[in-house]
Amino acid sequence: MKRLTPALLAVCLACSFSPAALAAEAQQTRAFRALPADFIKGADISTLLDAEKHGAKFYNHNNQQQDPIAILKADGVNYVRLRLWVDPKDAQGQGYGGGDNDLAATLALAKRAKAQGMKLLLDFHYSDFWTDPGKQFKPKAWEKMDYPQLKTTIHDYTRDTIARFKQEGVLPDMVQIGNEINGGMLWPEGKSWGQGGGEFDRLAGLLNAAIDGLKENLQNGEQVKIMLHLAEGTKNDTFRWWFDEISKRNVPYDIIGLSMYTYWNGPISALKANMDDISRRYNKDVIVVEAAYAYTLENCDNAENSFQAKEEKEGGYPATVQGQYNYIHDLMQAVADVPDQRGKGIFYWEPTWIAVPGNTWATPAGMKYIHDEWKQGNARENQALFDCQGKVLPSAKVFN
């Protein structure tokens, strides 16, 4: 995920538009062509627990308060993605924000999702806070480790985490080994470029160590799909460069994960061309593991949104409920159309991340850890699938 919040503040406009008027915009539904029965209709709900702790409430299409996971399930969502940070707090115990996704929070959400009959994708960040192509900070406890120590630690951490999920009865169905790791992970030892040579040898060693740790906990036919995830899903040259290098080093994996934001990355047609190519080139399944679009340009809090008029112009769809619906529909269809049934599904990024006072992308402690001093708040609530008052949008029905 790219930078989450701009530097400026916008006035609060939460009351200046009518949810009912927005809802009226998304009455036009569209059928899919040959969507497989097992197609993944996923949602990343990693901030949900923290939003609820700060007072967020959610309402179904009948205006009845309900668990948002149950609301999403009723609209067809069948898979949940949850990120995991190692230790998202400072030495004084101040949480970093962004969902405070430590082991306890992630397990709690995993149990709720599994109780709804959903499958689980666990997203290991191998950091204490946000990671993406521009930052891959080592966990604080790992900072002074050399490369051999990092290999041992990532192995043991992955092994022990999966063991805990098994113990709690929520073994993931799929695991990401790192998040948007175009630039590698656990910098600088695991960085994929600019380190004087041997970058992919070291990165592959870390990936293999983590995967070995995962597999130590699988027995009696248990299967967990392994995903490697890059950002900028339209950039075929990036995916070829990265996966060619990983393939040379025999890193075992099942799925290529892609992030896809049309307002940053370009049109869905370019994503489709990339998925067609890499699924054939590497003989792997593909999943769009992050995607989102705005349903309005209005703002629900004091933090200026990352999706504004510029993003609407570049994103290819109007910032309306119908536009959001059409974006998700077209994305799902593009993935389903990947040849040889290699396109397995999508995950919508943070449908439940509505604006709630106190629930922020980063606290001052979190900003200090990632060296990114911005304003607190939510810069993405206009891309949720619930409105500012917590009512599910008609666009969520696209999954049905």
Please provide the spans of the model-predicted regions.
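Bacterial N-terminal signal peptides
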Residues: 8-16
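N-terminal carbohydrate-binding accessory modules
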Residues: 24-77
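Aromatic-rich peripheral "rim/lid" segments of glycoside hydrolase catalytic domains that contact
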Residues: 31, 56, 273, 277-280, ...
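Conserved, mostly hydrophobic/aromatic
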Residues: 43, 72, 123, 175, ...
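Active-site beta-loop-alpha junctions enriched in small/polar residues
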Residues: 45-48, 85-87, 125-129, 177-182, ...
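Acidic-and-aromatic substrate-binding clefts and catalytic sites of carbohydrate-active enzymes
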Residues: 51-52, 56-63, 88-92, 96-104, ...
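Glycoside hydrolase catalytic-domain groove-lining segments
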Residues: 62, 66-69, 201, 215-225, ...
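Substrate-binding cleft and catalytic face of glycoside hydrolase catalytic domains
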Residues: 71-226, 231
